[in-house]
């Protein structure tokens, strides 16, 4: 959810 501000790959 926060992949757009924190590109950690946790979809």
Swiss-Prot record:
Coiled coil: none annotated. Keywords: Cytoplasm, Developmental protein, Nucleus. The keyword Cytoplasm applies. GO terms for cellular component: cytoplasm; nucleus. GO terms for biological process: actin filament organization; morphogenesis of an epithelium. It comes from the Eukaryota. Its main location: cytoplasm. Disulfide bonds: none annotated. Disruption phenotype: Simultaneous knockout of tal-1A, tal-2A, tal-3A and tal-AA is embryonic lethal. In embryos chitin secretion and formation of the cuticular exoskeleton appears to be normal. However embryos display a loss of denticle belts and dorsal hairs. Segment-specific epidermal sensory organs are present and segments form normally. The cephalopharyngeal skeleton is lost, and the head skeleton and posterior spiracles are deformed. In the developing leg, tarsal constriction occurs but the tarsal fold does not form. Induction: Polycistronic RNA up-regulated by ecdysone. InterPro entries: Tal-1A_2A (IPR055084). It is found in: Cytoplasm; Nucleus. This protein is produced by a polycistronic gene which also produces tal-2A, tal-3A and tal-AA from non-overlapping reading frames. tal-1A and tal-2A produce the same protein from different reading frames. Interacts with Ubr3. One of four peptides (tal-1A, tal-2A, tal-3A and tal-AA) produced from a polycistronic gene that function redundantly in several developmental processes. Required in early stages of leg development for the intercalation of the tarsal segments during the mid-third instar stage and later for tarsal joint formation. Promotes the post-translational modification of ovo isoform B (svb) into its active form which in turn initiates trichome development and promotes tarsal joint development. This is Peptide tarsal-less 1A. It comes from Drosophila melanogaster. The gene is tal-1A.
């Amino acid at each position: 959810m926060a992949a757009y501000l924190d590109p950690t790959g946790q979809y």
